[in-house]
Amino acid sequence: MTKQEAYSSSLYLGVCAALLSLLFTNQNHIIGFSLLSTFGGYLFLRKQSAKSYLPAMAGAVALLIWKFSMIHILLVGISSLLCVMYQLPYGVSLRNNGILKPISIAFAWTLNTVLLASADQFEFIPNDHSVIFSTLSVFTLTFILALYYDLKDSAEEEHKNSFAVKIGIRYSFRVAIISMVTLILFGIFYFDGITKETVALSGATVYMLFIHSKILNGKGSTYIIDSCFIVYALIFLAFKHLIQ
């Protein structure tokens, strides 16, 4: 990945994170933090120069100190720890553990979007803004996209021991579709009907068919995979406005 590709794709991921946060909060500082921390974090993970990611990270830290509560800081601390553990030397890095790699990525994204946005209004009962189901949705979606990332990069040495590459594209696709369909059915039962959450997940599941076909043809790209977040978020927002 070239310097320009790393910069633009990291920025795109930052926009994806901000859009996901927008689904769960209208607080600009939380949305801005998700954008800056994801953008800077991915530049760091992609081993870009400090001058490329430090401005974004500095902006994120400034927002954290100025606007966030202790529960927010705790969540950010956990997410930052995962980021550091992901980048540790070979043998102890989360990046090099076949199954922990997609789990850690999914957990970090969930912390940095839905849980960070919902930290001050967490409820354990089904309601219009269900943190529990949204947490499951973002975690599952990110976990599956992490598998697709490894399949896209399967020719590279660092991805050859990944969970997705070991089980192959066919079984990875089955894991993806079965997981998404199970979550959608659970959501219909959980909310006692079709909601914006389940409709958005359905749209993301259909989009995964497109990702799968592109990877099979050797044309998968970071933008094609990451756009699944955009599809999910836009359908969520559109359906939300339709039912209001």
Q: What name fits each language-model region?
A:
Residues 1-10, 50-51:
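N-terminal membrane topogenic signal
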Residues 12-19, 54-64, 102-117, 165-174, ...:
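Small-residue-rich segments of transmembrane alpha-helices in multi-pass membrane proteins
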Residues 16-33, 61-75, 113-136, 186-195, ...:
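Helix-coil boundary and interhelical linker segments in multi-pass alpha-helical membrane proteins
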Residues 30-39, 72-84, 134-140, 196-206:
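Hydrophobic core segments of alpha-helical transmembrane domains in multi-pass membrane proteins
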Residues 34-58, 139-182:
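Solvent-exposed interhelical
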Residues 42, 50-120, 208-212, 216:
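Intramembrane alpha-helical segments
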Residues 102-154:
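Functional transmembrane core segments of multi-pass inner-membrane proteins
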Residues 198-244:
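Extended hydrophobic alpha-helices typical of membrane-associated regions
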